[in-house]
Design a protein with these regions (language model features):
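ATP-binding pocket architecture of kinase catalytic cores
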Residues: 65-224, 228-241, 256-259
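Short hydrophobic alpha-helical segments enriched in small aliphatic residues
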Residues: 8-10, 14-17
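Active-site activation/catalytic loop segments of kinase-like enzymes and analogous catalytic loops
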Residues: 277-322, 336-353
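Helical subdomain adjoining the active site within ATP-dependent kinase catalytic cores
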Residues: 324-328, 339-393
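Activation of the activation-loop gatekeeper triad in protein kinase-fold domains
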Residues: 265-270
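Catalytic-loop of the protein kinase fold
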Residues: 241-243, 248
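Juxta-kinase regulatory segment immediately upstream of eukaryotic protein kinase catalytic domains
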Residues: 29-61
Length: 393
């Protein structure tokens, strides 16, 4: 596939990346940039005696004691590593403080993984769910521990030596999304995860409502973006399983192969609906269009570096693998940017109201403004279509 320096809007690639739900997993010997677990952060401790009582009778060996560590860097849900009788488990719970309605629904993520895992092996298996908030103060669940690494700022040296490593990971990443969207939602019963009819309309309205509830500053440009998304909704292709947060740092890669995806993580927003909404959000993270208002706030994206798929290559491989018409992908990219802005605004709203003391969130207001400016500039840009490819599905 030919390389290209332009995105779906005909503008240069962005050098900007937001990471607000990241996790790092590794075994010994990997780069310090991919640290595994560490001590539990102050203020995020769990009630170990209460947890131990709950585990007894559910996990063999729990009566002999448990050890607890934490996966670093997450900006929303909290993720811990449990060791019980020599076996590792992952515990997931929602964030501290008040959260937006329907956000960070650990019970739903547990049930989604229960349904998806048998049909998409990259989704981790889950074991136990507690909806009794008296145990840890929030709903939580246990799932299997998978080993691998998540790429962020650079490729570890032992992998960088592999021929064409970045290109091969790019291919595997796109192909994994293609497989996810190929799961038969009718035969597997996954259609029960959502209501495909009216998916885009509900997405725009639902995220607009979340924005209104979390607003801290007036942003007329966001009102314009919401109106544009409401008035320009394209016809959706046939519905599929939708991850709703598919990005490089939500995918666990093999430590010794460029072609193998060990796990896809963070399924709390998964549903069934328009697969191009997934693709649009993924493209927002992959390599963004250049925007002056973001230059001072961003950092170079790993996928903007030499060897990685360009956005054109990414879109073309997806089109060839699915046969879907991507001529309206520009709409879905604006939708993705809009959703990212709302997610960050919800986190910033919690910080402004003192519901979290995490200082990592103090500059999220500036990031939100940059995203809104980017979305607003894109809806006014004349080239909004990608060439038609494949057959409409």
């Amino acid at each position: 596939m030919p390389a290209s320096s332009e995105c779906a809007f005909g503008m240069p690639h962005v050098l900007f990346e937001l990471t607000f739900r990241g996790r790092h997993f590794r075994r010994k010997g990997l780069s310090r940039l991919h640290l595994d677990t560490g001590p539990v952060r102050p203020g995020e401790e769990l009630n170990l005696p209460s947890l131990a009582d709950w585990l007894r009778g559910r996990i063999a060996g729990a009566e002999r004691g448990i050890t607890l560590e934490q996966f670093p860097s997450g900006h929303s849900n909290l993720t811990y590593l449990l060791r019980i009788d020599g076996i590792e488990y992952v515990l997931r719970r929602g964030p501290l403080g008040l959260v937006a309605p329907k956000a960070h629904d650990m019970g739903r993520e547990f049930r989604v993984l229960q349904m998806v895992h048998p049909h998409f092996q990259e989704a981790p298996n889950v074991f136990h769910l507690s909806e009794d908030t008296a145990v840890l103060g929030a709903v939580f669940f246990l799932m299997e521990r998978r080993h691998g690494l998540i790429l962020r700022d650079e490729i570890p040296p032992h992998l960088a030596k592999m021929p064409n490593y970045a290109e091969r990971v790019s291919k595997a990443f796109v192909d994994c999304l293609i497989r996810l969207h190929a799961v038969d939602i009718s035969r597997t019963g996954l259609i029960a995860l959502g209501k495909p009819e009216g998916f885009l309309e509900r997405q725009v309205q639902g995220w607009a409502d979340r924005w209104k509830r979390a607003t801290t500053d007036d942003m007329p440009k966001m009102d314009r973006v919401i109106r544009w998304l409401t008035d320009h909704q394209p016809s959706s292709p046939a519905p599929t399983l939708v991850h709703n947060d598919y990005k490089l740092d939500n995918v666990m890669l093999s430590q010794d192969s460029a072609e193998r995806i060990e796990a896809v993580l963070d399924w709390e927003m998964a549903t069934v609906g328009d697969p191009l909404a997934d693709l649009g959000l993924t493209l927002c993270y992959w390599a963004w269009v250049e925007a002056p208002q973001l230059r001072a706030r961003g950092v170079p994206s790993l996928t903007s570096q030499p060897g990685w798929y360009t956005r054109d290559q990414f879109v073309r491989r997806y089109a060839e693998g699915t046969g879907r018409d991507l001529s309206q992908i520009g709409y879905y990219e604006v939708l993705g940017i809009f959703k990212l802005a709302v997610i960050l605004q919800q986190i910033y709203y919690r910080f402004r109201r003192g519901q979290t003391q995490d200082t990592r969130f103090q500059n999220f207001g500036d990031r939100v403004k940059g995203l809104v400016e980017l979305a607003d500039s894109l809806i006014q840009y004349p080239k909004m279509e990608y060439p038609k490819m494949g057959k409409s599905t």
